[in-house]
Amino acid sequence: MARAVGIDLGTTNSVIAVLEGGEPTVIPNAEGSRTTPSVVAFAKNGEVLVGEVAKRQAVTNAERTIRSVKRHMGTNWTIDIDGKKYTPQEISARILMKLKRDAEAYLGEQISDAVITVPAYFNDAQRQATKEAGQIAGLNVLRIINEPTAAALAYGLDKGEKEQTILVFDLGGGTFDVSLLEIGEGIVEVKATSGDTHLGGDDWDQRIVDHLVTTFKNQHGIDLSKDKMAMQRLKEAAERAKIELSSAMETTINLPYITASSEGPLHLEVKLTRSEFQRMTADLLERCKGPFNQAIKDAGITVNQIDHVILVGGSTRMPAVVDLVRELTGGKEPNKGVNPDEVVAVGACLQAGVLKGEVKDVLLLDVTPLSLGIETKGGVFTKLIERNTTIPTRRSEIFTTAEDNQPSVQIQVYQGEREIAAYNKKLGMFELTGLPPAPRGVPQIEVTFDIDANGIVHVSAKDLATGKEQSMTITGGSALPKEEIERMMRDAEAHAEEDRRRREEAEARNQADTLIYQTEKFLRENADKVPAAEKANVETAIANLKKAMEGSDVTAIRSATEQLATESQKLGAAMYAATQAAAGGSSGSATGATGSASGSAGKDDEVVDAEIVDEGEK
């Protein structure tokens, strides 16, 4: 049975984990790192770069480098590269393909099944988009689970039978979630969740970038925000400074040759203290309080009832965030035994193990983060499923017509907490037609909402008089038609094929280069010993291989390489034969010399027959 993996598809970094002998193991990528930057770049030569290599070239290729694409999931955002529009799903799929490829190389086997995590506060469109990204990457997405739930699963499985209340405070690169869970006797139950899908470490970085731009403008009168290459350098420097300020009280941001004026090159050097940084990001920290209080209220508990606090996401390493959590939880010390970067992927792979039957006696009960309902007369949002309802779930309600002889009803589906439908997130709409003429208020239309374990919504409407039914799986917002997903999968496969061809070409060229170098070196060093005929053949083969390398036909390069290898072997054989022949003549005289030596030895018997006699035998 193929193994299933758990993937934390993050805004800034992504992680993949697998169960090895029942124990979760984080899989290092091809570069040897346990986290992979969620960065995708399209090189000028058409090559698609993912991870660390994409991040490294971002400064010189800013316009064709995409980072933090998770923030665009579930929207109509696209990026145009060489006349082709890419959706957030396609860009995310590149990251997933890199994780999948590296994991397959590490494990030595194919991977098809995966559990992928999303922020708890992701709406339906964002979840659907994540599932589609997995499909485009060639993965069978077993389940979409919430990041805080995965973290609690990773933390709580070995904590025994005692029931505990756990708070997961998850501040990642681009999203923020707070979840309250109860863990005990193998059951992980989410009681409440709240969050902000547009708050994360990126926002802290941006404050430093804004500060640097303002400082530089005041000093030199030049606005760096107009220079894409400079902005890319500022972003990287801001991220480094933020990380440094988690352990140091002060850091210096030093960027030589950031731009140039009429007088010559200009350099940026700015000192930033931790207190300054905390001052300029105080409002971001303040935004964390709302979702925290909401989750506590929805769970119907007090902070005193929280047994453990788990910090998830790299941004929770900031001292100000740790202090805030301590303050909000009444002085509780956050758990230090959890790696905030890896715990989500570990939980995801445990859930994959549960679904595959490898992990026994574990039940995961998750919730829907936002209320679901439809628009009714007057633009009112009528909720059918309240937020924090345990999923999977199914709810039905009877509605009627607003006009006499109404031939059809339009069902508009929304997700959110506002009383007026238009202020919530519209997930989609469909129409139930063919209603028989009747006065208003008479027809009975049953609307049913069904949320599966992935948190993805299915809606149906049925006229109870005629039995006519209309249903839909919500594909509003960003969700892609099936044909579009299939096209993107083909594209992704074609790119994988293209990457494989590029790799093969590079390997063939390296092999050819090495052989040419070694052969030419051999010819130079043995110029006086090489037979003329074989030398001419080898030189012709070298010329043919160099000509083949001017093109990009891998078969031609390989064929010419083989030809040169064959001619080199013939040359070696000819040289060996010539050396043997020469050695044969000289070995005859050597034998004569040996014969005379033994002859002379025969004349002196004392030397040959001498024996060592033990003193005791005399």
Swiss-Prot record:
GO terms for molecular function: ATP binding; ATP-dependent protein folding chaperone; unfolded protein binding. Residues 492-513, 579-618 are annotated as: Disordered. Pfam families: HSP70. SUPFAM superfamilies: Actin-like ATPase domain (SSF53067), Heat shock protein 70kD (HSP70), C-terminal subdomain (SSF100934), Heat shock protein 70kD (HSP70), peptide-binding domain (SSF100920). The keyword Nucleus does not apply. It comes from the Bacteria. Residues 579-601 have a biased composition (Low complexity). Keywords: ATP-binding, Chaperone, Nucleotide-binding, Phosphoprotein, Stress response. The modification Phosphothreonine is found at residue 175. Induction: By stress conditions e.g. heat shock. Residues 606-618 have a biased composition (Acidic residues). PROSITE patterns: HSP70_1 (PS00297), HSP70_2 (PS00329), HSP70_3 (PS01036). Residues 492-510 have a biased composition (Basic and acidic residues). Acts as a chaperone. Belongs to the heat shock protein 70 family. This is Chaperone protein DnaK. It comes from Acidothermus cellulolyticus (strain ATCC 43068 / DSM 8971 / 11B). The gene is dnaK.
